[in-house]
Amino acid sequence: MHMLFRLRRLSLRKRICLAILLFYLLTALLAPLFMPYSADDFSHPALLSPGAGHLLGTDEMGHDIFSLLLNGFRVSVALALVSGALSTLLGALLAFCACYLGRAADGLLTAFANLFLIVPELVVIMFVAVFAAPTTGNTVLVIVLFSWPRVFKIIRGRIKDCISGSRVQYTLMMKGSVLDVARKLLPDVLPSLQAFFVLQCNKAVLYETTLAFFGVGDPLAKTWGKLIRAAMDYENLYYDNTFLWYLVPPVAAVVIFVVSLALLVTEEK
């Protein structure tokens, strides 16, 4: 009941965004049930137009594009959730350590975060990804390691404001444990963490798509970025409206997902 009450209080825009994101999540979970063919099956005739047997046709290798798109939901959404959760958790933990351990730790971690923020995240991520082994695990690791500083900076400021409050100060005075202090801080910090998790998922999809598009992602992962790259490599993409069923679906999947995440955490005027 409490959850329903909270949903009713949301604006129409945010409810639409939540519905879209729920659709993405369910599609990612249930994709194997709806995929007519395996994403690795290339036994079909190449470059078939959309029809009853292939809703979005086939690519140059004979893969069913609809199956590749659904598989992209699985891989890209899972990668976004894992990368978003880990980068948010890492940034929040380091922010807590900076505030809890004192001035020396705060200065060191803040300087370290500022060092990462000098160069745009995407530039650093692409540079490191070029030299790392092209696996999905390394893609997640690179995204997490180079996208936590912004989380750290904002959450650190929030914790500094909250740690001077009476509840936390009383816990510190009574020699409470680290977990006791964290428990007192969590209610005040949780809304910021939730917003950052959504934003980090947003960035993870954009970064993975960019890495796959430029050929430095996992070559075996059937993601939306990989499908977009394959479509762009097809020399006759814009002949006979091929782009409408080859390029537009994965681009639309990325754009709708990213925009829905962004609008979900954007304050309305």
Residues covered by each model-derived region:
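Periplasmic/extracellular loop-to-transmembrane helix junction in inner-membrane transport proteins
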Residues: H2-L10, Y37-S83, R229-P249
